[in-house]
Amino acid sequence: MEDYFAGKLTEIQETEDTAYLLENNEIFYDIGYKVMQNQENVNLLKCHRLKYNGKIKLVYFTRDDTSLADCLAKSDIDGVLNLIHRLIEAMLQIENLGFLNMACIDNRLSHIFVEPGTQNVKIIYLPVNLAGVH
């Protein structure tokens, strides 16, 4: 498990999917979560909110996708440029939604995903409200 946001968020590595556990339920950003659920944004990974030992667990189904890090490692220069272009487009699309703070994106290349076949870039947005972030 890895800690993020000064230990207020922990990544859980228990399945093929990606999940995070909020150490304090008060940091959950309900407006951001609702914006995510109401958007038909092809670049946001769908977030599922569950309860886990009384804490909020955020689950993103990533098992069918490939990490951007793996895609970049296997791509030629044209493929790399295409993936970078798609990543920039995805970031701009999310930024234009409003209500979502770009600082709450898990920006590690191993946690940005590419959908096989379509090559759509999928991004994990963490709906959290932290001092200095929102």
Where are these regions (language model features)?
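Conserved structural core of kinase catalytic domains
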Residues: 2-84
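A general structural signal for short secondary-structure junctions and capping/turn motifs
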Residues: 11-12, 98, 113
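Short, surface-exposed, polar/charged, turn-prone segments marking secondary-structure boundaries
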Residues: 49-50, 86-90, 133
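Structured beta-strand/turn binding interfaces of compact recognition modules in eukaryotic regulators
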Residues: 63, 110, 124-126
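Elongated alpha-helical scaffolds
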Residues: 82, 86-89, 113
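Protein kinase catalytic-loop region centered on the HRD/HxD motif
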Residues: 89-103
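C-lobe/activation-segment region of protein kinase-like
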Residues: 102, 115-134
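Hydrophobic residue at the +6 position relative to the catalytic HRD Asp in the kinase catalytic loop
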Residues: 105, 110-114
